[in-house]
Amino acid sequence: VWSDEKGHYAVLSQTLFYPESGGQPADRGVLRGPFGEVQVLHAYEEEKAFGDVVHVLSAPIPEGVEVEGEIDWPRRFRHMQRHTARHLLSQALLRAGGYHTVAVSLDSPVCTVDLEEEAEEAGVLEAEALANFAVYADYPVEAFYVSEEELARYPLRRPPKVRGKVRLVRIGDFDLAA
């Protein structure tokens, strides 16, 4: 637990708050304890702190107290849906016109997908139809981990940015991504 001129922070022994990562915005919510309730405004993973999740708080909390966290579930669920939709759309764009996704924004009211090249209208319409087909097919979403050595066996859209154990997400037989 610490504070500086920019804000108040806490690293917990366990957390369900998702840190901003992989194009998905961080969770928000509250921490409750003997001090009352404080807002969790943001969460991020701190590599210098061995991958701990840092919770950015609206007010300081005492060190060493037990807390209970509650995430803003409607926000989290919306981001989960958008993130999965982004996987479907990126794969559909790749299949429809060879369009490669380079960046996404999921946090605003309007989500955006940036492509390496400009997409033609026919390619976008085909991608939309493919993505809708995947939604209606109700493919299962499965997450699993593989070692770096095992990665070569999986046909990924792009190489992962992480090393060591890599988390893969498979959406039926439609998409597989790190």
Regions found by a protein language model. Name each.
Residues V1-A178:
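Active-/binding-site microenvironments in catalytic and ligand-binding cores
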